[in-house]
A protein has these predicted regions:
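An N-terminally focused, membrane-permeabilizing/fusogenic/translocator signature enriched
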Residues: 1-136, 144
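Polar low-complexity intrinsically disordered regions
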Residues: 1-8, 150-162, 181
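Residue-identity detector for glycine
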Residues: 49, 64, 71, 119-120, ...
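Membrane pore-forming effector domains from diverse proteins
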Residues: 97-135, 156-227, 246-265
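Glycine- and small hydrophobic-rich membrane-insertion segments that are intrinsically disordered
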Residues: 136-159, 226-251
Length: 265
């Protein structure tokens, strides 16, 4: 009876469990040495990790010397403690501290590959981050204009504030190409993005496209939404694994980030 109770409390994971249809990895995983209570329990002998629930979040902890048994790849390596799953690959985990920057670079690379596959002669990806105060100020201005019956309030505010709307604007990628007949690109992070899907469909159907500009919200293709980040931060606080910046603040920043995707054929 005690062993059953210990097993239920400690939730050890064994290599055989990985083949079970009932087992799945959590989106957030931890790579850490076995702790004292698991190391000293007979029910955890030969285990490769364990499951736990921190606040409302299920977390799988993997022992470093057993990580290879899970068949995962880690970015940048397996030396970090906390990882979150890549939204495009369930077997690829990204260090939590690197998560948003990694996905930014990966998506810029994908947009470049899409342009090349579609036979673009020129493309540019401009990365923009909206100021935190801009959303609130814009909303107030629009509401104020509506209250006064000014139909053009939105446009006027947008024009006046455009130069100061963003805290960051940078050219993330730009290239001149020879151009060629389109080849259907393999979509990864943008496989559900309606604008990119429309671009591909138009180009493959030989529509006379010449110049297209799209605004792509990064929050649409990220793996951590603000609601997820709140749960992650609560779990990390419970585990006493709080870093310099909260995941919630990063996710909120991500919700203000955009790619302006300009492409010429």
């Amino acid at each position: 009876m005690k062993q059953e109770a210990d097993k239920k409390a400690l939730c050890p994971i064994f290599e055989d469990d990985l083949d079970s249809a009932d087992f799945s990895l959590s989106k957030l995983i931890r790579v850490a040495e076995i702790d004292k209570k698991h190391a000293e329990s007979i029910v955890c002998q030969d285990s490769i990790g364990f499951e736990s629930k921190q606040k409302d979040l299920r977390i799988v902890t993997i022992y470093p010397d057993k990580a290879s048994a899970f068949g995962l790849t880690f970015y940048p390596d397996s030396e970090s403690e906390l990882y979150y799953v890549d939204p495009s690959d369930r077997d690829h985990y990204i260090a939590l501290d690197e998560y948003f920057n990694y996905l930014k670079v990966a998506r810029v690379s994908e947009l470049q590959k899409i342009a090349q596959d579609l036979g673009a002669k020129h493309f540019r990806v401009t990365y923009k981050e909206q100021k935190k105060s801009f959303e609130a100020n814009a909303a107030k201005a629009i509401l104020g204009a509506k209250a006064q019956g000014k139909q053009s309030g939105n446009a006027e505010y947008s024009h006046d504030a455009q130069s100061s709307a963003f805290s960051k604007i940078e050219i993330a990628a730009e290239m001149e190409c020879i151009g060629h007949k389109p080849v259907e690109p393999k979509l990864v992070y943008f496989k559900k993005d309606p604008q990119i899907l429309n671009l591909v469909a138009l180009r493959l159907s030989d529509n006379p496209l010449t110049h297209q500009v799209y605004t792509l919200a990064l929050s649409n293709s990220t793996g951590i939404k603000v609601k997820d980040a709140i749960k992650i931060d609560a779990a990390l606080a419970s585990m006493k694994c709080i870093g310099n910046a909260t995941v919630t603040s990063e996710a909120q920043s991500e919700s203000r980030r955009f790619f302006e995707y300009e492409i010429d054929f």
